[in-house]
Amino acid sequence: MASDAPPGAAARPTSAAWTAVYDQVRELEGRRYPDAVVARLPDVPREDPFHAEWRCRADSADRLVHHLAGSPMPLEIVEVGCGNGWLSARIARSVGARVVGIDVNVREIDQARRVFGSVPDLSFVVADAQLAGSPLPRPTTIVLASVIQYVADAPALLRRLLGWLPPGGELHLLDSPLYRPGEAAAARSRSEAYYARLGVPVMAASYHHHEVGILDGFTAEFLHDPDALGSRIAARLPGRRPSPFPWIRIRRPAEADRSARDR
């Protein structure tokens, strides 16, 4: 698995030129799927070159859906950086919540609408993560799956999105690498070499290697830690493919909690 260049949708303030570069990379990687394949994601044939990665994405999606389905309150969910919409559709079908998927990539939003347009309580909007909120319903829950690595200032984006949530609302980060202190430089070099081999070296400047420290100052909890003993044991079991990336829940504090913290 090429963990330094994982699959996913870009959701960062960007120009049409940057989106074109992103699309070029996905074409060269062979990650552009026809509608019939997108409709079945995350299930892909064994012969698909990214079969192992999609098994990991299925694992993280299952965990997320199980968590959301157990909510005691009605949910309004926004997936930021939804790409072709497969995860938004999975959530809408399984959780019984209203779901809005947003992405800056017009091509991917068009495909999401074609493939999943008939799913109840699901819609897709071309929108920038930094501008999210104005024309959209206020969510109780925000999902960023394989997104944060395309954002240069991750803490600023997290603060902005948390401000869009009500007190107690949840933001979920998943399917993105977060590095221990000292690991990011080597990962950055691997990504630069990867995009150079692919023939699109400019993409390396937009693929960011965040350390766990970006979570400092947030009310963050690891709901899946791939480095935990139980996760490492599960990864060795036959037939299992747990996600190698963490799943992190960040809550917007209740106003009373925030006031106490600020004193």
Regions found by a protein language model. Give the residues of each.
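N-terminal, positively charged/glycine-rich alpha-helical extensions of SAM-dependent methyltransferases
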Residues: 1-45
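Class I SAM-dependent methyltransferase "Motif I" SAM/SAH-binding loop
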Residues: 81-83
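Class I SAM-dependent methyltransferase SAM/SAH-binding core
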Residues: 86-131
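A short SAM/SAH-binding and catalytic strip from SAM-dependent methyltransferases
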Residues: 141-154
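Conserved class I S-adenosyl-L-methionine
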Residues: 172-195
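Short alpha-helix
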Residues: 203-223
